[in-house]
A protein has these predicted regions:
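Charged, alpha-helix-forming regions
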Residues: 4-255
Length: 255
C-alpha cells in the first residue's frame, strides 16, 4: 500500500523510484489512477481474504452495504459520497497494470501484472442495502495472487479501519508490520530514502519527516509492539512481533 500516491495524480501513469527499484502504475486514460485511502482499504481486504481463503476468486458480499461494512465505510450518496468514491476507486484499482523493475550495474529484472483478471460488481448505488441477483466477485490475477500468498503482509483489518483517514499512516503500518515479519536485526533508514519510498510530495525532507512522525504516532497506538526509534538521520526499526502472525502454511487454492 505504501507505493500508492495519497493524492490524485494527473494523467494515467505514475512512477516512483527507490534506489534500484522502480514501480510503474498504468491505468486506462478514461478510468484514471487509483489514489487516496479507499484503494488502500481495498488492497488490505483483498490480500487478507486471498490469504485466508487460499483462493483467487473472492466474493464481496451480496450487497454494496455489506461490502462497505467490511471496509468500515458508511454508505452515503451524492457526487462526493462514499458510494461514489468506492465505485470509482474500485474501477481504477482493478483496471490498473503494475510493473516493477530492479536494475543495478549487474542485473535487470522486470515483472508486470494486473491485480485482477475479472471483476463483477452487482452494486446498486440507489439501494445499497438491496442484495443483487448474484454475488459480486473479483478474480485476482495469478501473478498477483501468487505474490500475495508467497509474501503475505500480516495486517490486522481492525488497525487498517482505525487508520483509514490517513493514507500515510496506512502505508507506514503495512510497511512496519511487513518489515517486522522478517527483520533479524535493527536497521536504520535515512529520511531521504523514506521520502522517496513513500512517494512524498513534500518540497523538503524535513516537512516529510514531520508528517511521517505525526502519522507514526497514530500507527503506534494500534501497533504498540513495534520497536521503532528516530533521530536526525533516519528511522531505526528493530525486530518486532508482527501485528498478525503469518500463516504457517500458504498453498494456492483452486482457480
Amino acid at each position: 500500500m505504501c507505493i500508492r500516491d495519497s493524492k490524485k495524480v494527473a494523467g494515467n501513469e505514475f512512477e516512483r523510484k527507490n534506489g534500484a527499484y522502480t514501480l510503474h502504475l498504468l491505468a486506462p486514460a478514461k478510468v484514471g489512477l487509483p489514489y487516496g485511502t479507499v484503494p488502500r482499504l481495498l488492497l488490505a481486504w483483498l490480500t487478507t481474504e486471498a490469504v485466508r481463503t487460499q483462493n483467487r476468486e473472492l466474493f464481496l458480499g451480496d450487497s454494496l452495504s455489506h461490502f462497505m461494512h467490511e471496509l468500515d465505510m458508511v454508505p452515503t450518496g451524492g457526487r462526493w459520497g462514499s458510494i461514489t468514491r468506492l465505485k470509482d476507486q474500485t474501477a481504477r484499482l482493478f483496471a490498473s497494470t503494475v510493473s516493477a523493475t530492479y536494475a543495478d550495474k549487474r542485473s535487470h529484472t522486470e515483472a508486470g501484472f494486473r491485480l485482477a483478471d475479472r471483476s463483477t460488481l452487482w452494486w446498486d448505488a440507489k439501494a445499497p442495502e438491496q442484495a443483487g441477483l448474484w454475488e459480486s466477485s473479483v478474480k485476482l490475477s495469478e501473478t498477483f495472487f501468487n505474490e500475495v500468498i508467497a509474501h503475505p503482509i500480516p495486517v490486522d483489518m481492525r488497525a487498517i479501519r482505525s487508520l483509514k483517514k490517513s493514507p500515510l499512516a496506512l502505508d507506514i503500518y503495512a510497511w512496519m508490520t511487513y518489515r517486522a515479519s522478517y527483520a533479524t536485526k535493527p536497521s536504520e533508514i535515512p529520511w531521504q530514502a523514506l521520502a522517496m519510498q513513500f512517494g512524498s510530495d513534500y518540497a523538503q525532507v524535513r516537512d516529510f519527516k514531520a508528517a511521517f512522525l505525526d502519522a507514526l504516532k497514530k500507527v503506534l497506538i494500534v501497533y504498540p509492539e513495534a520497536r521503532v526509534s528516530h533521530g536526525d538521520f533516519g528511522l531505526t526499526l528493530a525486530p518486532s512481533r508482527p501485528h498478525v502472525r503469518k500463516p504457517t502454511k500458504a498453498l494456492p487454492g483452486p482457480g
